[in-house]
Amino acid sequence: MNDSILEPKHRGNVREIAAIDLGSNSFHMIVARIVNGSIQVLSRLKQKVKLAEGLDENAVLNQEAITRGVNCLALFAERLQGFPMENVNVVGTYTLRRAVNNDEFLRQAAKVFPYPINIISGQTEAKTIYAGVCHTQPEKGRKLVIDIGGGSTEMIIGDDFTPLMAESRHMGCVSFATQFFTDGIISPENFQRARQSAVNKIEDLGLEYRKLGWQSVLGSSGTIKTVAQVIATNLDPNGTITAERLNALIEQTLQAKHFTELNINGLNQDRVDVFVPGLAILSAVFDVFHIQQMRYSDGALREGVIYSLEKNFQVADIRASTA
């Protein structure tokens, strides 16, 4: 990343803003420039922190995970030198919501990171994800948006830019890895237990969501991105996820006995340890909501946070003007 582009410039109507998403698997930062109401993404930075891995059964976040998170924030702070407070929006998600000692994380973070951290509710997270997807995708009309994160999964139905239903449930690829795939061991039984647990967490939403209906289904964040990449590499250049392709991928995945044995074209090494639990959650989502096909959206929570900092930008420009 070129640090020089991060100097806040206020010539004319130019403003630079930053959005940071403290996720349960990775921390993400986007820096964007607002020019006369239009947004241009200048840079993106992602660090795998695996915060959720440090959450024990009593919802206490261990010091190792806190240290990983704080070290990442120190790096982000270097990149943001000179940014005024009002131009930076930082949100904490599932793991920081859940941790009973999140005040300790915030205390240690404040020593290296000068910007306030807002720990947001699951519903706020869901609505912000929806805004991020809507402002980066061309689909019009009613859509279902699914976001599988490290610690939680968000499900939102909306018309154009207005969310109608937004829910967040405690199931994510990092937390499920710890819960159902101890030491990275894969078995059909482990997979089915994870999948059934996900079904149990969302089946109360199925009927209500299906009654509302939708014209298109969009998925965001790492699990769905990875599944789309694997499908694009092996089955369909467009990376469209269908129920049939998902089942074929599950069948292939279950031939491995351990995360380290996953040898799937298109699967990046940094996703190997969360791919199978993410797949179990996605399979449950497809079943409960009777999804026929889903397309990956590269807009998600951090894009929604950028949008919340600058509500007046022209919607088309986040697609057209990405640097």
From Swiss-Prot:
UniProt-recorded Gene Ontology molecular function terms: exopolyphosphatase activity
EC number: 3.6.1.11
Topological category with respect to the lipid bilayer: Peripheral membrane protein
InterPro entries according to UniProt: ATPase_NBD, Exopolyphosphatase, GppA/Ppx_hydrolase, Ppx_GppA_N
Cofactor(s) recorded in Swiss-Prot or TrEMBL: Mg(2+)
Location in or out of the cell: Cell membrane
Gene Ontology CC entries for this record: plasma membrane
Gene Ontology biological-process entries: polyphosphate catabolic process
Catalytic activity, reaction form: [phosphate](n) + H2O = [phosphate](n-1) + phosphate + H(+)
Keywords: Cell membrane, Hydrolase, Magnesium, Membrane
The keyword Cell membrane is annotated on this UniProt entry: yes
Keyword Membrane among record annotations: yes
Subunit field text: Homodimer.
Protein function: Degradation of inorganic polyphosphates (polyP). Releases orthophosphate processively from the ends of the polyP chain.
Similarity comment text for this entry: Belongs to the GppA/Ppx family.
Protein name, UniProt field: Putative exopolyphosphatase
Species this protein is from: Haemophilus influenzae (strain ATCC 51907 / DSM 11121 / KW20 / Rd)
